[in-house]
Amino acid sequence: MATGGAAADLEDVQTVDLMSELLRRLKCSQKPDKRLIFIGPPGSGKGTQSPVVKDEYCLCHLSTGDMLRAAVASKTPLGVKAKEAMEKGELVSDDLVVGIIDEAMNKPKCQKGFILDGFPRTVTQAEKLDEMLKRRGTEIDKVLNFAIDDAILEERITGRWIHPSSGRSYHTKFAPPKTPGVDDITGEPLIQRKDDNADVLKSRLAAFHSQTQPVIDYYAKKAVLTNIQAEKAPQEVTSEVKKALS
């Protein structure tokens, strides 16, 4: 991490947060840089593992949806262009998304690297991402593919139930409420998200596989892909992820 750049970045940190930011940088200074991509279908556990890896290696988590919303809200030049596209009902171009990722990488919390989640979804996007990273003199270090059988995913997702006001979640098989269909704390009814039914899930998985397999093949040819057996218990998956990144 360049010292001059790091010092300049501190100008953007509010005084009240300055000490915690300096302590974070001290802790992170000995960590190796890592630029990672997490690939996996809905329910594969990426969201569970991302915070663990982020904290362990002092990385930032880059979700394309979050970055687009932040760029639009802060009215950056790229954010303005993205907003124009969205207001016209158009897809935000690959170049624009890569540009927003490029901007996000300049943030102090991304100086040791990042976890990219939700991008790239196509080989063209992967190529554009590689081109941008090459201009920065860097590259993707590792792509983790959270591989899991569709039948296991269906069991995981279709059994999920939520208590709307608190966000508490249950599972009919793995973490059932004391009384079926009722929140343990309030006694209020539980609901199931619209996306958590078998038909919607099968459609999403079919789209994921057809769209993402070429991306998996792309990174496999570059010898940076590791398959993670995501059907295991979360702690076992964490161990496998750490082993892959060591």
Curated annotation (Swiss-Prot):
PROSITE patterns: ADENYLATE_KINASE
EC numbers for this chain: 2.7.4.3
Residues carrying N-acetylalanine: 2
Localization annotation: Cytoplasm
Keyword field: Acetylation, ATP-binding, Cytoplasm, Kinase, Nucleotide-binding, Transferase
Binding positions for AMP per the UniProt entry: 64, 69, 90-92, 118-121, 125, 193, 204
GO CC terms of this entry: cytosol; mitochondrion; plant-type vacuole; plastid
Stretches for region NMP: 63-92
Classification via InterPro entries: Adenyl_kin_sub, Adenylat/UMP-CMP_kin, Adenylat_kinase_CS, Adenylate_kinase_lid-dom, P-loop_NTPase
Keyword Nucleotide-binding annotated: yes
CDD domains, per the entry: ADK
Record-level Gene Ontology MF annotations: adenylate kinase activity; ATP binding; copper ion binding
Keyword Kinase attached: yes
Catalytic activity: AMP + ATP = 2 ADP
Residue sites binding ATP per the record: 43-48, 160
Role this protein plays: Catalyzes the reversible transfer of the terminal phosphate group between ATP and AMP. Plays an important role in cellular energy homeostasis and in adenine nucleotide metabolism.
NCBIfam families: adk, PRK00279.1-2, PRK00279.1-3
Homology family: Belongs to the adenylate kinase family.
Name recorded for this polypeptide: Adenylate kinase 4
Organism expressing this protein natively: Arabidopsis thaliana (Mouse-ear cress)
The encoding gene: ADK1
